[in-house]
A protein has these predicted regions:
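Conserved catalytic core of the tyrosine transesterase superfamily
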Residues: 1-295
Length: 295
């Protein structure tokens, strides 16, 4: 267990992974540790055959293929660390392939659904202004909820309409917002936020009714409430506005590298999942480009 604790500390101090990510790694690696302990095998002495047996064990749990892939990714990282620290000579998990799985396209909102959601907040109230700004920022910038809650007043450049956000791995990036978001931002900062602040000293942009900054859970609850009041039948996950941002940007001509940077993805392959297009667009492209499609 000492090696596991050292690895988790490495993820925290050197890699700057979030607490949630580290907990996920810990669960996956401890599961591995307990499996081999039950077989009386030391985790630093496993063989290729042992790794194959462990893969069979994961399949026996009847969990989905994405979860198995995630667990294998955690374990590979752990053994790569052990190789680097010269605790083991070879990472046999690098020889294990992830299970093949069907790639599911991210769900996104259509324009009419967005309009319904944006109409819910009452802009005559401080909380309504704040809630509308939450929607505007998530859709206008594509940031994660975890990044949204950490926005401070001094990270916003209202002149250039940019925000400095802290993403995964403590990496900073600049995101841009448009004029519609700007109007709500100005309204909230000048009016709603001042009322919520109640003479408190708080640098965070988004506040609750007591003048304290919001948590990610609070944001999700706000989005759930807006979704119910909007009458949208589909369940709106908090990531769906991020998916919609990426989809709309690409569908309207943005290049994938720019969208990758705005989303804070390390690898363009992660962004490429958003390059799907709607059936309506396929039809429009066909009708406008194919000579036999025109009347």
């Amino acid at each position: 267990m000492k090696l596991i604790n050292e690895f988790l500390e490495y993820l925290k101090v050197i890699k700057h992974y979030s607490e949630k990510t580290i907990i996920s790694y810990e669960f996956d690696i401890c599961e591995l540790y307990n499996y081999f302990k039950s077989k009386k095998i030391d985790i630093i002495n496993i063989t290729r055959k042992d790794t194959e047996a462990y893969l069979e064990f994961l399949y026996s749990l009847n969990i989905d293929k994405n979860t198995i892939s995630r667990k294998l990714s955690s374990i590979r990282s752990f053994y790569n660390y052990l190789v680097k620290e010269e605790k083991v000579s070879y990472n046999y998990f690098n020889l294990i392939s992830n299970p093949k799985h069907k790639i599911s396209l991210p769900n996104y909102l259509k324009d009419e659904d967005l309009d319904k959601m944006f109409e819910v907040p009452d802009l005559t109230t401080p909380l309504g202004q704040r809630n509308r700004l939450i929607l505007e920022l998530l859709y206008a910038t594509g940031i994660r909820v975890s990044e949204l809650v950490n926005i401070k007043i001094n990270t916003i450049n209202q002149y250039n309409r940019t925000i400095k956000v802290l993403g995964k791995g403590e990496k900073e990036r600049i995101v841009v917002y448009g004029h519609m978001c700007e109007n709500i931002m100005n309204m909230y900062i000048k009016d709603g936020r001042c009322q919520l602040l109640k003479n408190k000293n708080n640098d965070y942009l988004l506040l609750n009714k007591n003048g304290n900054n919001l948590s990610t859970r609070m944001i999700r609850n706000i989005l759930d409430d807006i979704m119910i009041k909007s009458g949208i039948r589909k369940h709106v996950h908090h990531h769906m506005l991020r998916h919609t941002f990426a989809t709309d940007m690409l569908n309207n001509g943005a290049d994938i590298i720019s969208v990758k940077e705005l989303l804070g993805h390390e690898n363009v392959n992660t962004t490429s999942i958003y390059t799907h297009v709607t059936n309506e667009q396929i039809k429009k492209v066909y009708e406008s480009c194919h000579p036999r499609a025109k009347e």
